[in-house]
Every structure is written in structure tokens, then in C-alpha cells.
């Protein structure tokens, strides 16, 4: 007999929530039947894979599973770089799963108007269940097409909670096709991000001031430009899901991976950028080749470079702290005690953001988060002790399908004429949808922000969101916010 899951009854609240004082770490909510909200700005494996210029994606799985990825490719206008191989029942019964992948991929490559330099082959859950020999499959494909770089990718949601997540795997596969080449001590790479690092971010400002060449997959327009990333002496990641890929890249190509922890905390920002400065001075030496043909910098040049990095960092810190203090003052003067809701899609440290805002006088009421990131553990503990009534809400719990109908923001005057009309300010798309507010920050995955610039930009976006309404319906349903960078 079928039973209704979380049936909505008149006068009964079914929306799950927990005070942070009682929230477990890292999972404050029980796992079960899941709901997917219409807020679709975060990227999926199709979007991320399209970052490799000129590469072709081939998905091998059941027809039902193909619908979502096909729609993603169609919506972003990249169907010319996308193909599928459907697994049918007879393939399971006949035991020809390996042959299906090999021959299916080969047939697609043979029919393309031009052979791509790289092919990303996505196998799925069914290959995992049936014990398909993936090593043999890729060995055969590489024998047939030695001029093509193949990357083993996965559309395997059953592995979400064991080992590397699909997102971590996909970010690591972004750099598998890179060929080993001599390292250039004047070059660094920013890796593992869907969105480009902001030019005025503290990270980019530091690297530019140091005179280093910056490689980033989002700026590559050709496969050859993409291959130039392999010359980097340091790979810098600031998305936690990019860390496994950065470690793999360092092991394979020989550069050093440096994880720059994303933060809103002043002491942590200073500490993290101090560590990065040390890595740069140890691994990089931007000298002209004619000055020292044997490679590296003469000792006096190395000392000069280290001093340049230290001086640049000192300026960035001083300017950043001053800008942060002013931004807090200006934003708080506009927003006042307006309730604030944050969700995890905005940045890698949602509890870190909540802590920063609460400590600076903002009225943060809710954080939408299904699991708490490891980096947020100190913030979780701090908030439990200092702001125990902060409420945590899930985003995938089945009962959350009722959330947006329970929150209704007043219609009528804008914030410019009537501050009372802003019932809640949302930071992130899911918070905007669940709170049903027109006043929200429309950013995903940190938006390429780092350091003090991340703090000041976030505050500026909050002020703008308070003053100007947006259409939730029109904006949050756009799949893969910023994915137009993939259309080359």
C-alpha cells in the first residue's frame, strides 16, 4: 500500500529545521527521500566537462538517465560537442557491455566532422554494478585513436557518499588530458573552478603583482592553450572539491599543489595568503630566460622576487582590511536588522559567512545546508556556543517542497521607498527560492572571489540585493550560472 511522504496537513508544520546548538556534525539531518528545488544555478558534470576546449563528451548509460545530461547540453548550446550511447537490456543479457562502449565510442568518433583532440567518456552506475573492465576499454580506445586524449569520467550518483564524490571526480578529470612538459617557474595555474577567478580578487592581485603568468581553464580558447597549463610550477585551488584533483595533478606532472582555504575570517585570510606567499617564493622565480639560461633565478633575483611577493601581500592586506571595515559600515547602515538567510550554493563556507555577518551585527536567521563542510567545523562549534538559536534548514529533504509556499514576501513598494517590505534578504539561489524573496544575491560557488575581496564583494552584493528586486523565477531556473564561458 502506498503512503504519502510528509503529507501536508492544515496547521501542521512539516518543514524540518534544527537549532545549530543541537545540530550534529557533519550531518545535521537524516538522509532519506530527496527533493530537488528549481534553483539550478550550480553546475553539473556536463557544464564542467565543457570547460576543456574542443573536447567531446560521450555518455554511456540507460536512456532514462540520459535525459538530464542531454537537456543540459541542449540548453547551453553545445550539442555539437555531445553524444550518447544507450545501454539496453540486451546488452546486459548478452554480456557485451565492454564491446558496446568501445564500438559505440568508436562509431561516434568516426562520424564526427573533425576528430576532437580529447574525448571524455562518461560511464554510469550500470557499469559499476556489472563489473565492466574499464581499464581494458580505455586501453582499446587509445590503441584505436592514439591521437586522441581519453579521460575516464563518471555519471555515477550511487557513489555520492563513498570515496570521491562525482563533483570531486569531475574536477580531477578536467586536467587528465594535460601532457607532461618542462615546468616554467614563471607560471602558475588556478585549478578546479567552474567560474573564473575575479581579476580584482586578492589571489589574482597577488599573482599579478608577483609578475607570474596565470593559467586558468576558463580562459583557454583552444586545446593548445589548455595544454599550456601543464607548464605551471604551482597549482592553486580554493574550492574544497578541487583538492583531490590538485593532488593528482602534482603527482603526475611534478608541480606543487597549494590549497588556499576560502574564508571570511580576517585571521584565517591572513594565514592562508601567508602560506601561499611562502609556496610562491619557494617554487616560482619569474626571471627572463636570457638572464639565466640554465633555469631559475640568480640568488639576488630570487631575493628580489620574495620581497616583491611580501610587499604585494602587505599592500593587499592593508587595503583589504580598510575596504572590509568600510563595507561592513556601509552595508549595515542600509540593511539594518533585516533577517538574512544563507545557503550553501553561494560559497564553500556558508557557516563561515554566517559567523562573520553575525559578529558584525547582521541579523542572520537561517542557513540552508544539507551537510556541513569540513572547513566549517570551527565555525560550527563557534556558532553553537555564541549564536545557539541560528536555525539550519536542509535543501533536499522531501518536506522542503512546501517551503516556498510558506514564505510570502509582501508585494508593492521597493526597498528604496519602504524598508518594511523587505521581509528577508537571501544570500544564494536556494535561500531565495525557499524564502520566496525578490531580494537575493545571485551567485554560485563563490563567484571567483577570494580573500578580503570576497568579503567586501559579498557585502556589496547584499546591499545591492536589498535595494533592488530580482525575479526569482527568471533567474534561479537558469541552469549552470555563468556556463556561457564554455561556448567557444
What would you call each of these model-derived segments?
Residues 1-488:
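An N-terminal assembly and electron-transfer interface module characteristic of large anaerobic redox
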